[in-house]
């Protein structure tokens, strides 16, 4: 466990890894032994490796002779850590000797084997039994002397160099020496109440120094030490005087350039910057602090000046000895430019902007320093890198102009010249264009070149927030010859492997560290230089999951403690200028940067131990993601509920008393509570003590909530000890499989880490990984031996299609028309992609029971759009593993049934890499994907893939699907033992056999682009929010001759539809006289397509037809079979449809039957599809396609009242080639926990299953069908778009027949301005008494409240005797009802075209003509009455926007009936009202 230590150096967290996770008695001097002593002892030790299935797992045992006692000691490394056994007694007097008696006879004479047996028994006895139960709750058998002896018999001796390597790795991995955690984050929580503000401020004052910024450039900047410097040669070969005049001139030019630039930098520091710094420190410049000054003129300029001085000294020393020595001096000094210049560039990125503000603010205070103008300052700050280009040009001339005398000089000069060029080119050089899928976007959006192979998908987005904290060169402790890179971001830590890194660093010349080059690329947004070695990602971890500890000489260990994949990796820093504690401190700062809520920052530094305290407000802290397990609560009552609210393991509750004493209560989740008191001066010391007590137990003890993760990490370390390079290389190949070969992700891809339904442009899901169990190789071996006699030989099964070179477009198109060879088909279908078949180190088997598919963990598991489309199986569907016939892609259902009845059938133990399925092909029943119809949530298959991917995807279920050839009947039995799936599929097939008219063809045909399909998919499309927003306020159609852009819906206000029920909801209507059946009758079709599991969740098909409506030539049949439920198979005939119609109780004319039969028997060749529109049902969630339609007249309900998305009407005689864009459900509409759909599906949990209820229930009558469907449409949020014949209520049935007999659009001459009169009916007299006053008193207010949704045309109500234009009287309700019916019979709706109206006047008369127009006298009195009477009110708010058109009724002449009613009404008015109106 970890122990707290305080010594003369200071306080620190000491991780004593010499102890195990479970406490046991151990000698203290064993734990304090130095690493060098351990290396000497373990180098001579006898090392054994073993595997214990009961408790210890894989373990390593070291038996060595202790120098102090000359007796045998034993050291064990297993899943609970390192355990020391001192002075092991192997004599027969030992109480552990029975373990020796259980050894083999040949082992009983070996002392080391006897010590091993005794040690295995003794270590179990020393451990606390309650702690042993944490390893395994219940032991299947006792761990006793027999178990220990047998385990010692099975241990293998590690001999030779391997044994010495294990001993060294025990030290290098930090397993036998203390590890330290010197940097921690402490969360402080306070409540923002006025009564505790002062007390909180007093307490946080003692938490340390409050920091304004997390990174201080002054304290954290350290110049790079010059390890190599130029020295003049001992023996003089040549001198500058011996050179040609041209060479002398070039060398002197180089020296002069460097002299002038260096002197200008030195003068800038001495005359301007240093005096200005002194003034800022002395506060002589008002408002100018040191921090502000260093932001403008960063300290990096000092380092740049220092490097230039070193370079100038080297040139001066080398110049007398000739051009070759000048090149040597440049090659030795140039590498030191890199780090200084790149940091200076990053620090002065915004200097040109900041200097203007600086001079305008403080220019007057710098009057004595004004000889440096803005332009001169800008030139000096940005000058260093500009001078590098000039230096390179001069060196190029120097190297090219010299004729080297000997080959030795030529080689030496060439080496120096190449070294100089590589360094200067490392600052950034143009590269040829590269693909974007392996590039990374910088915070400003600039694209970098490929950083590394297998770049994690988690780091391909959020670059606007991500910051680069540090990049470091490291050396792996498992392979000292290997060079790696550690990149610390603000949210992730990435470990990169440098491919052939030893070659890059080999040689005499000093090269820039790859970490510095990478830092320059990330910070300054420049491409990587071409000479940098290739990098690949080893692993990456979220910053909050990583615990960094230091040990030895500049060594670090990164432990990832998440529940999913705990891991550990150890490195040694390659540069001696960087300390391991500094890297660990940066990781703590990165965690603080990842916080997403506001906080106050405090820092406490006690020697090498740093504590960063982040103070959060209590309510805001509840939403924080990055939290510390130990939380300090200020003036908050202690309670376990407070710990649970903030996800804290232990809380320290501090409250300030009146006498400035602090009461501290330490409370754990287990209820343990300790109380202590301290003064304010000792408050911080007491907090540090509590941290030193908590974190050792939290990071390495049996009581830690991370105990399981810690045990898994120890198991990995044991594997590393036994096979260090194998684990190291395996991790690389595993990562390459995960990121590079499995999926090359585009760098700008945004993924939801966690849901397969969230897609990104350019990708499709080609395969869903299965949830599979893992067993160890030893378990697999043991299980396979027991099954060897019962299992036949099993051939390899192809799981992925072979990936060929991408074909051209012409090749793809030509491949659709010629018949492929059988061998070619077999090769394409059975071939495997070996690049995708990598084993991750474990053997996978399938479970006995059907398991659910695992959702995609990350976008890495998505595949690019390929030439073979694999149907994505959602996570909600059950896994289907079926026996596949060698010749067909259909399911061998009888083999499934036999396997179900076979008691001896077992699941085959087939290794399956993660993310791959056993079979590529999904189960198909008569050419239809059964898995597709079992889905609960289907994805939209809209093409949003890579535009440069494969051109023509083949439909699933086509001839070239993957099949498994050569499988015997026994193999099929073993591969298909999922009983539930077999029963479901057999039931589905039996239903299809009972319904022969609905059987689909056994195999799908490839659809050639350009030919329409003859079968009609069931189309469900959803409402587009943008469509409703743009067209929700418009009305429908005027006349056919009008422009298509003017076709909007007239009439039928929402108030009329809803309030008076003019058009009640009815069943889905007919197309060309063909009526859709009631919903319940469709169950016979649906049963053949849908599994019974998902009846409640799958959208119901509402219409069936045998006519093709698709002429979108780019869409293939296979795609529609996946996108939409095909309710009508090819074999369905017109007679079948007619027979069903008669059953439903509907009929159509004989002419329509003949016409329908002709259309059904006509085979489409190249002509467009028939001019028929299918029954369309709007649902809340539906995919969208562009449809090219030639359709008949359709009556569509009001857009506003019914929520319709489409409004479109055409003539019977004239085809309209119009593309209708249906509503597109964007990616945000997919059901994802992080993406809320724009329109949620309307669920009706109370609605019974239609299929179950209607299969046995007979169809009673038309009215019952209508009632059933009306309820369904109301509950599902569905409206009728295709109804042609409307069955109105009995009171309006006569009016409905007239509308049907006289269609409103048949007469195209109604293209002038007409008013249409509806058939509104009043419900009560209260409405008539309130409308008149409301009409005029509120017209102004109503006009302000309601926005115009033009073009809008309105319909006036009937002018009957009891109407007051919009008001009704209750004189004779019965008579009014009869008049409404009569007028409905006589009048019909009249239509108007907006394109035929002048914007001001229809007759194009001047405005003065209408100014002279007066209101008829017979209407003047009534108009005056309506203006004065304020009692008239509207019950329906939708009438408000009709008010502005009421005045038009005054210009229409009324008939005699209306005049009589007006006179009668005026005679009955009392005298007071008459006087008031006059």
Curated annotation (Swiss-Prot):
Cell cycle as UniProt keyword: yes
Spans annotated as Disordered: 732-889, 1085-1106, 1146-1168
PROSITE patterns the record matches: DH_2 (PS50010)
GO biological process, one term: cytogamy
Domain of life: Eukaryota
Protein's UniProt keywords contain Cell division: yes
Subcellular localization(s) per the UniProt record: Cell tip; Cell septum
GO terms for cellular component: cell septum; cell tip; cellular bud neck contractile ring
SUPFAM superfamilies xrefs: DBL homology domain (DH-domain)
Predominant place of localization: other
Keyword list, A-Z: Cell cycle, Cell division
Bias-annotated ranges (Low complexity): 763-777
Listed Basic and acidic residues bias regions: 1146-1160
Cited InterPro entries: Bud3_N, DBL_dom_sf, DH_dom
Molecular function GO terms recorded: guanyl-nucleotide exchange factor activity
Biased composition (Polar residues): 749-761, 786-800
Function comment: Required for proper septum positioning and septum construction during septation. Acts as a landmark to mark sites for future septation, and as part of a scaffold that recruits components of the contractile ring to the site of septation. Not required to determine the site of lateral branch formation.
Membership in a protein family: Belongs to the BUD3 family.
Name of the protein in question: Bud site selection protein 3 homolog
Upper classification of the organism: Eukaryota, Fungi, Dikarya, Ascomycota, Saccharomycotina
């Amino acid at each position: 466990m970890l122990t707290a230590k305080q010594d003369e150096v200071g306080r620190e967290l000491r991780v004593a890894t010499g102890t195990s996770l479970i406490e046991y008695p151990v000698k203290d001097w064993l734990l304090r032994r130095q690493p060098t002593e351990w290396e000497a002892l373990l180098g001579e030790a006898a090392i054994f490796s073993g595997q214990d299935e009961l408790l210890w797992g894989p373990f390593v045992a070291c038996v060595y002779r202790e120098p102090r006692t000359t007796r045998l000691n034993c050291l064990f490394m297993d899943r609970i850590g390192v355990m020391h056994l001192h002075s092991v007694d192997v004599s027969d007097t030992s109480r552990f000797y029975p373990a020796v008696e259980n050894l083999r006879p040949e082992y009983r004479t070996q002392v080391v084997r006897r010590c091993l047996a005794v040690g295995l028994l003794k270590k179990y006895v020393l451990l606390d039994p309650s702690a042993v139960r944490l390893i395994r709750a219940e032991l299947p058998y006792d761990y006793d002397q027999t178990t220990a002896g047998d385990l010692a018999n099975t241990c293998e001796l590690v001999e030779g160099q391997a044994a010495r390597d294990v001993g060294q790795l025990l030290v290098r991995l930090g397993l036998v020496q203390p590890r330290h955690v010197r940097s921690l984050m402490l969360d402080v929580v306070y409540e923002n109440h006025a009564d505790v503000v002062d007390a909180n401020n007093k307490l946080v004052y003692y938490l340390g120094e409050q920091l304004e910024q997390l990174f201080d450039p002054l304290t954290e900047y350290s110049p790079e030490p010059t390890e190599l410097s130029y020295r003049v040669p001992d023996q003089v070969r040549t001198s500058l005087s011996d050179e040609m005049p041209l060479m002398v001139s070039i060398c002197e030019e180089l020296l002069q350039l460097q002299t002038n630039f260096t002197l200008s930098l030195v003068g800038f520091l001495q005359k301007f910057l240093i005096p200005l710094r002194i003034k800022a420190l002395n506060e002589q410049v008002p408002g100018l602090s040191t921090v502000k000054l260093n932001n403008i003129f960063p300290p990096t300029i000092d380092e740049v000046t220092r490097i230039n001085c070193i370079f100038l000294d080297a040139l001066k020393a080398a110049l007398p000895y000739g051009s070759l020595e000048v090149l040597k001096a440049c090659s030795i000094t140039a590498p030191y430019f890199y780090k200084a210049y790149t940091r200076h560039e990053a620090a002065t990125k915004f200097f040109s902007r900041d200097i203007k503000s600086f001079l305008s603010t403080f220019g007057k205070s710098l009057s004595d320093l004004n000889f440096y103008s803005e332009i001169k300052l800008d030139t000096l700050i940005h000058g260093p890198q500009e001078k590098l280009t000039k230096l390179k040009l001069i060196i190029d001339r120097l190297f090219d102009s010299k004729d080297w005398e000997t080959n030795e000089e030529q080689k030496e000069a060439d080496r120096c010249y190449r070294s100089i060029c590589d360094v200067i080119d490392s600052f950034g050089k143009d590269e040829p264009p590269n693909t974007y899928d392996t590039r990374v976007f910088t915070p400003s959006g600039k694209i970098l070149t490929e950083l590394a192979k297998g770049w994690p998908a988690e780091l391909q987005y959020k670059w606007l927030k991500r910051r680069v904290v540090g990049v470091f060169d490291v050396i792996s402790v498992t392979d000292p010859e290997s060079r790696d890179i550690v990149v610390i971001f603000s949210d992730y830590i990435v470990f990169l492997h440098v491919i052939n890194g030893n070659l890059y660093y080999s040689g005499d010349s000093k090269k820039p560290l790859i970490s510095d080059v990478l830092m320059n690329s990330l910070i300054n947004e420049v491409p990587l230089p071409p000479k940098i070695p290739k990098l690949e990602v080893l692993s990456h971890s979220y910053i909050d999951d990583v615990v960094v500890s230091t040990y030895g000489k500049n060594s670090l260990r990164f432990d990832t403690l998440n529940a999913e994949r705990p891991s550990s990796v150890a490195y040694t820093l390659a540069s001696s200028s960087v300390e391991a504690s500094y890297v660990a401190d940066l990781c703590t700062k990165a965690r603080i940067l990842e916080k997403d809520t506001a906080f106050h920052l405090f820092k406490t530094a006690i020697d090498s131990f740093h504590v960063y305290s982040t103070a959060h407000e209590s309510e805001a802290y509840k939403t924080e993601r990055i939290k510390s397990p130990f939380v300090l609560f200020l003036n908050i009552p202690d309670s376990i509920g407070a710990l649970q609210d903030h996800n804290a393991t232990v809380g320290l509750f501090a409250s300030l008393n009146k006498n400035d004493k602090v009461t501290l209560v330490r409370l754990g989740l287990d209820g343990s509570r300790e109380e202590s008191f301290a003064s304010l001066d000792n408050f911080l010391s007491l907090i540090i003590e509590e941290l030193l007590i908590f974190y050792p137990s939290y990071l390495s003890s049996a009581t830690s909530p991370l105990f399981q993760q810690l045990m898994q990490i120890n198991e990995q370390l044991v594997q590393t000890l036994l096979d260090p390079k194998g684990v190291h290389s395996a991790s690389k190949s595993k990562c390459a499989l995960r990121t590079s070969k499995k999926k090359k992700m585009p760098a700008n891809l945004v993924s939801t880490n966690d849901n397969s339904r969230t897609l990104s442009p350019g990708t499709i899901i080609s395969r869903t990984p299965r949830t599979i169990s893992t067993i160890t190789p030893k378990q697999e071996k043991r299980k396979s031996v027991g099954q060897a006699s019962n299992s036949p030989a099993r051939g390899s099964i192809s799981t992925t299609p072979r990936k060929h070179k991408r074909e051209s477009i012409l090749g793809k198109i030509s491949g659709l028309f010629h018949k492929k060879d059988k061998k070619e088909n077999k090769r394409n279908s059975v071939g495997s992609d070996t690049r995708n078949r990598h084993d991750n180190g474990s053997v996978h088997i399938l479970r006995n029971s059907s398991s659910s598919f695992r959702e995609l963990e990350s976008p890495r598991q998505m595949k690019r759009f390929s030439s073979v489309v694999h149907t994505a199986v959602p996570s909600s569907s059950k896994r289907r593993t079926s026996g596949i016939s060698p010749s067909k892609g259909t399911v061998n259902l009888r083999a499934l049934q036999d396997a179900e009845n076979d008691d001896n059938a077992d699941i085959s133990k087939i290794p399956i890499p993660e993310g791959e399925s056993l079979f590529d092909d999904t189960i198909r029943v008569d050419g239809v994907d059964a898995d597709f119809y079992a889905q609960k949530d289907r994805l939209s298959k809209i093409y949003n893939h890579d535009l440069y991917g494969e051109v023509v995807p083949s439909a699933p279920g086509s001839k070239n699907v993957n099949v498994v050839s050569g499988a015997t009947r026994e193999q099929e039995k073993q591969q298909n033992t999922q009983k539930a799936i077999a029963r479901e599929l057999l039931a589905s097939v039996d239903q299809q056999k009972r319904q022969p008219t609905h059987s689909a063809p056994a195999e799908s045909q490839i659809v050639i682009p350009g030919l329409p399909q003859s079968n009609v998919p069931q189309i469900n499309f959803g409402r587009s929010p943008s469509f409703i927003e743009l067209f929700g306020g418009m009305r429908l159609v005027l006349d056919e001759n009008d422009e298509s852009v003017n076709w909007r819906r007239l009439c039928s206000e929402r108030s009329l539809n809803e309030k008076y029920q003019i058009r009640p909801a009815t069943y889905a209507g007919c197309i060309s006289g063909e009526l859709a059946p009631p919903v319940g009758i469709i169950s016979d079709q649906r049963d053949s397509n849908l599994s019974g599991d998902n009846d409640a969740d799958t959208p119901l098909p509402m219409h069936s037809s045998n006519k093709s409506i698709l002429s979108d030539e780019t869409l293939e049949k296979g795609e529609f079979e996946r996108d939409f439920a095909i309710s009508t198979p090819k074999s369905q005939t017109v007679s079948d449809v007619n027979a069903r119609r008669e059953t439903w109780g509907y009929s159509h004319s004989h002419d329509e039957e003949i016409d329908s039969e002709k259309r059904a028997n006509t085979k489409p060749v190249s002509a467009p599809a028939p001019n028929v529109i299918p029954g369309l049902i709007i649902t809340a969630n539906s995919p969208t396609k562009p449809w090219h339609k030639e359709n008949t007249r359709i009556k569509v309900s009001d857009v506003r009242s019914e929520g319709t998305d489409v409004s479109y009407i055409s003539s019977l005689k004239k085809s309209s080639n119009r593309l209708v864009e249906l509503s597109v459900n964007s990616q945000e509409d997919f059901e994802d926990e992080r993406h809320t759909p724009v329109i949620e599906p309307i669920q009706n949990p109370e609605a019974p299953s239609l299929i179950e209820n209607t299969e046995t229930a007979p169809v009673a009558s038309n009215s019952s069908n209508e009632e059933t469907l009306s309820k369904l449409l109301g509950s599902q949020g569905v409206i009728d778009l295709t109804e042609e014949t409307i069955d109105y209520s009995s009171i309006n049935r006569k009016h409905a027949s007239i509308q049907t007999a006289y269609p409103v659009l048949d007469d195209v001459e109604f293209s002038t301005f007409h008013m249409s009169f509806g058939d509104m009916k009043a419900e009560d007299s209260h409405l008539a008494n309130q409308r008149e006053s409301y009409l005029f008193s509120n017209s102004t207010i109503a006009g302000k409240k309601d926005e115009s949704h033009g073009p809008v045309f309105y319909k006036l109500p009937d002018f009957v005797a009891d109407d007051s234009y919009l008001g009704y009287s209750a004189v004779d309700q019965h008579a009014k009802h009869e008049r409404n019916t009569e007028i409905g019979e006589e009048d019909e709706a009249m239509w108007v075209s907006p394109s035929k109206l002048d914007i001001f006047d229809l007759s194009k008369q001047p405005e003065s003509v209408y100014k002279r127009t007066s209101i008829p006298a017979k209407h003047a009195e009534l108009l005056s009455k309506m203006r004065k009477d304020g009692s008239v009110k509207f019950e329906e708010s939708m009438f408000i926007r009709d008010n502005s058109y009421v005045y038009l009724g005054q210009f229409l002449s009324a008939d005699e009936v209306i005049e009589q009613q007006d006179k009668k009404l005026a005679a009955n008015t009392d005298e007071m009202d008459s006087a008031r109106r006059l």
